[in-house]
Amino acid sequence: MRATTKACHPGLALMAAGLLSLAPSAARAEDMAGMPGMSDPHARCHQTMSHLEHATRTTADYALPEVGLVRDDGRAVTLAQALGGDRPVVLDFIFTTCTTICPVMSQTFTRLQAQLGDQADRVRLVSISIDPEQDTPARLAAYARRFHAGREWRLYTGAAQDSIAVQRAFAAYRGDKMDHTPVTFIRTSPGHRWVRIDGFASAEELARELHEQVAVH
């Protein structure tokens, strides 16, 4: 496995800062936690975002579990089908009630679609819920509309154990959705290694990664 470290894109940092300004600060969240009825369920996410300054790139091979998922249109598919085909795929993990990390990552996917332009139909974007018990297909569909998801960006839910199995397979399982961190995965085609980006990568960085990987392979 090889890794490089690069600074978080300024636009993403500003977006994250803006989201944080709309929510209680980490210190304030801790104060609220001790007050009846005033705990902030997203406090740990706020703390995570406040410490994210760099995105780290690594490459890895992941063994995909044989699990089923449910797409935002209600269609049952396997994980292999969701990630299959010979097109490049970009994957992340989100949940629809997240107010910190997920909106930033989903906005990045929105911008990535624009960055890809007429090549957008050749890249599959996949977002898998880490809160499948709450994220029904209808909720995912509404979330997709909120972020102007194109036809090649699909969101998936399913049984809790299947979501956890996928997260574990990608070494992204944190045990609690409130402890999740931003991580994005890119694969040019089946059989090739995944590029893993921990932290906030910009749409421009993801598009550049896709172009570089396709050129190499």
Regions found by a protein language model. Give the residues of each.
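Extracytoplasmic
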Residues: 59-64, 84-88, 120-125, 135, ...
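Hydrophobic beta-strand positions
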Residues: 68-72, 186-187
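Short, internal strand/loop/helix patches
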Residues: 142-181
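Thiol-/selenol-based redox modules, centered on thioredoxin-like
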Residues: 179-217
